[in-house]
């Protein structure tokens, strides 16, 4: 496909070049024909003059002069025509070169772009093939891990541990840190009950989360899925959590417990089979939660902590503002003292200058008129006219602090 395009461009360039040469040749032939006509006309006139010279010897010199001038004019005309033709063909050649040069450059650029595209396309095909191979390998690995996970979840102990791991992953996604934002496997003060996760809330409060994976062997059955026992296990666990009454053992907790189901499919299947589960759980102070709803709740708690920290920072800024205000009051007082001292110093300097000008300087001028003085003349001191700028008013610290405290009470 590239070769026909290149040949077409080259044929087009050749046609343009030969068309220009043909036009130039036509113009040159036309000028040559006009030149020959002029030569013939001049030769005819020359014949007439020769005939006239034969009739009159008196005009021989004139005819000779005219012939010489005619020869010179013809030579000059031929020379001018030759130079004009050379210049014209030279300009035409340059013009064609300027026309063909961009075309050649465009063809070269197009060829380079095409080669680059083919190289890149080959590289992309290689990378795509490699990625497809990796994807197939990952798919096989995922299929193997799915079978392994299915075998593991058939054991009750593994199912419980899987639920706890899923809960910890949700906590990590929410940006919470263990022992900082939450505690795991915390025992109550009486030591009788142990909560899976306790989330710390602002104002020394907490939220209790219990992870449950109510999965039976029939849940993984491929031939005939019977998920009726899923609802029974969830109802049984709701009764267990109600009997434990975590909110009474952990006094800073709200009067409910979050029952975390570690899978959107578990939550959806349970609600689809028994929509009354939400109402049953709420009446028992147990809130059912899927991974997504729990993540949204944890994000909300993180936002509450952010607002709590922001409020503490605002209070700290308020205290720092009060302290800064007191310290600035002291600084402003020192500034005022410095200004007063500067003004007193300037006033004393001006008084000394005035005394020197009117009492001491006249006597010194008399000394300068005598031979006993030196050749140097004592310069007259210049008084200072500007004074130190004072603050427009004194900062009333008690009034300003009272205003700040009143605004804080309103907030």
From Swiss-Prot:
Record lineage: Bacteria, Pseudomonadati, Chlamydiota, Chlamydiia, Chlamydiales
Coiled coil: 26-64, 123-143
Keywords: Coiled coil, DNA recombination
Organism encoding this protein: Chlamydia pneumoniae
UniProt record similarity statement: Belongs to the RmuC family.
GO biological process, one term: DNA recombination
Repeat found in the keyword field: no
Protein function: Involved in DNA recombination.
Keyword S-adenosyl-L-methionine belongs to the record: no
Record-given protein name: DNA recombination protein RmuC homolog
């Amino acid at each position: 496909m590239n070769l026909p395009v290149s040949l077409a461009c080259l044929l087009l360039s050749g046609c343009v070049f030969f068309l220009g040469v043909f036009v130039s040749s036509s113009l040159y032939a036309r000028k040559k024909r006009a030149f020959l006509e002029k030569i013939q006309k001049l030769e005819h006139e020359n014949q007439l003059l020769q005939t006239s010279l034969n009739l009159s010897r008196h005009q021989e010199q004139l005819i000779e002069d005219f012939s010489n001038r005619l020869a010179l004019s013809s030579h000059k005309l031929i020379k001018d025509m030759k130079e004009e033709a050379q210049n014209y063909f030279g300009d035409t050649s340059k013009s064609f070169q300027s026309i063909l040069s961009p075309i050649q450059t465009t063809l070269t650029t197009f060829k380079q772009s095409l080669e680059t595209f083919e190289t890149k396309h080959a590289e992309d095909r290689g990378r795509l093939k490699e990625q497809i191979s990796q994807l197939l390998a990952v798919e096989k690995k995922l299929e193997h891990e799915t079978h392994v996970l299915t075998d593991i979840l058939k054991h009750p102990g593994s199912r419980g541990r899987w639920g706890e791991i899923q809960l910890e992953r949700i906590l990590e996604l929410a940006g919470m840190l263990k022992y900082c934002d939450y505690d795991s496997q915390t025992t109550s003060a009486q030591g009788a009950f142990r909560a899976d996760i306790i989330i710390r809330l602002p104002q020394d409060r907490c939220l209790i989360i219990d992870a449950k994976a109510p999965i039976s062997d029939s849940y993984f059955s491929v031939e005939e899925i019977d998920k009726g026992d899923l609802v029974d296990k969830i109802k049984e666990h709701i009764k267990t959590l109600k009997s434990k009454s975590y909110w009474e053992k952990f006094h800073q907790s709200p009067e409910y417990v979050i029952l975390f189901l570690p899978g959107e499919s578990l939550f959806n299947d349970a609600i689809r089979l028994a929509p009354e589960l939400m109402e049953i759980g709420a009446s028992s102070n147990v809130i059912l939660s899927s991974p997504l709803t729990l993540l949204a709740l944890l994000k909300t708690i993180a936002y509450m902590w952010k607002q709590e920290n922001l409020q503490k920072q605002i209070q700290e800024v308020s205290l720092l503002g009060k302290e800064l205000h007191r310290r600035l009051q002291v600084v402003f007082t020192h500034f005022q003292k410095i200004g007063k001292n500067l003004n007193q110093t300037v006033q004393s300097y001006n008084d000394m200058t005035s005394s020197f000008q009117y009492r001491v300087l006249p006597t010194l001028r008399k000394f300068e008129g005598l031979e006993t003085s030196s050749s140097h003349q004592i310069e007259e001191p210049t008084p200072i006219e500007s004074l130190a700028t004072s603050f427009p008013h004194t900062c009333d610290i008690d009034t300003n602090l009272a205003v700040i405290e009143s605004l804080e009470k309103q907030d």
